[in-house]
Amino acid sequence: MSLIIRNLTKKFDDKTVIDNLSYEFPDHGVVAITGESGIGKTTLLRIISGLDYNYSGNVRGGGIGHVSFAFQEYRLFPNLSAIDNVIFAICDTKNEAVIKKAKDMLISLGLKESDFDLFPHELSGGMKQRISLARAFLKDAPTLLLDEPTKELDKENISLLTDIIQKISKDRLVIIVTHNLEDIECLSPTILQIS
């Protein structure tokens, strides 16, 4: 099912942050959402994901079960190791196949096997971000929502990230909120400018 937004308006008290937005997303590919800080980009992702229902208008094709979200704040479980954070987020059963998928994804995002047993308080911001991204990539959802996915990454890790997004976006929709289009220009994203 395509993700379609019709006449979406979102207010915080008397302040309108999204005003009558209508947009039909493609079934696959990369869409970059840009705009000034505080304009409603992350709020739009929260609405698409089904985490925010306090709006007027219509959103079809989003919601829990249809999207996978890599938050800007990482949202890792503090009592789980890096590998277990990924496994727990994608599956409630820990078996060899799931462990292999999680390890392969973490390695493809530039983490080392020695990082797998580290807990969030032992990880750098970039490592936390890549674990959050691994969780989103491995969830079986037709739409991925990535909020500032390159924020904590160096050029080498941005390159690894864009390689994965390039592959995933062949049959899934990847929506990226970013302030830095330069980091993802190699993906040739469709640009949705919010003002």
Per-segment meaning from a language model:
Residues T34-E36:
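The feature captures the beta-strand-to-loop junction immediately N-terminal to the Walker
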Residues L80-D92:
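Q-loop/switch helix immediately C-terminal to the Walker
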Residues A97-S114:
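Conserved ABC ATPase "signature" region
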Residues S49:
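Helix-to-loop junction immediately C-terminal to a conserved catalytic motif
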Residues L3-I5, I18-N20:
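Conserved structural motif at the start of ABC-family nucleotide-binding domains
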